[in-house]
Amino acid sequence: MIDLSGQTALITGASGGIGGAIARQLHKLGSHVIISGSNEEKLKALGNDLKDNYTIKVCNLTNTEECSNLVAQIEKLDILVCNAGITKDTLAIRMKNEDFDQVIDINLKANFILNREAIKKMMTNRYGRIINITSIVGVSGNPGQANYCASKAGLIGMTKSLAYEVATRGITVNAVAPGFIKSDMTDKLNDEQKEAITRKIPKGTYGMPEDIANAVAFLASKQSSYITGQTLHVNGGMLMV
């Protein structure tokens, strides 16, 4: 059984559905969770659910100094889950430079800073687990998401590079790539749109945020000590790689 008692985990994007599920699961397994995001009210609501053994840290990931300080404020960090991300979808011929830059800055650059600062702390203890949340489209591509796909593909490459650099230091760096996961966004789709998507999924259903949380929990555990530089796809068979 996975036991994270005595460990501290930082989860970014914790105010969203997947981030909240990850925080709940790591908390359930005994970890002190530091829940971070830009929406303080949603973080407080999550904290009320957790009741204890949590800390709220509001952070604007577009500010590189705030990214660095977010990790610097933590005395001991065992687990980092980089889950925060944004989309600015449109066809490439209509995509503005700032739409591309904003997605790269938050989805890739901010996560690099968080990974780098976490590694500095983890190297001191010669132990750490880093899990970067990427996406199925970081491998498959998707029309109208050139910026988002580039950021998520970059996250996979970054994960592999960092895994090489710290493999002898007791630190693992892995990624989890969600497919279509039930969310507020998918709930707004009409029946025809939902059916079109589920037809592409061999399992025939959307995933749940808890499916991602379970994958993260395993990669955050000591049981995954011989796994690093990998991307765990959680997509119901929609993409088999």
Curated annotation (Swiss-Prot):
One of its GO terms (biological process) is fatty acid elongation. Pathway: Lipid metabolism; fatty acid biosynthesis. It holds the Pfam family adh_short_C2. The gene is fabG. It comes from Rickettsia bellii (strain RML369-C). InterPro entries: 3oxo_ACP_reduc, NAD(P)-bd_dom_sf, Sc_DH/Rdtase_CS, SDR, SDR_fam. GO terms for molecular function: 3-oxoacyl-[acyl-carrier-protein] reductase (NADPH) activity; NAD binding; NADP binding. NCBIfam families: 3oxo_ACP_reduc (TIGR01830), PRK05653.1-4 (NF004199), PRK07231.1 (NF005559), PRK12826.1-2 (NF009466). It catalyses: a (3R)-hydroxyacyl-[ACP] + NADP(+) = a 3-oxoacyl-[ACP] + NADPH + H(+). The active site is at Y148. Keywords: Fatty acid biosynthesis, Fatty acid metabolism, Lipid biosynthesis, Lipid metabolism, NADP, Oxidoreductase. This is 3-oxoacyl-[acyl-carrier-protein] reductase FabG. NADP(+) binds at G13, A14, S15, G16, S38, K57, V58, N83, Y148, C149, A150, S151, K152, I181.
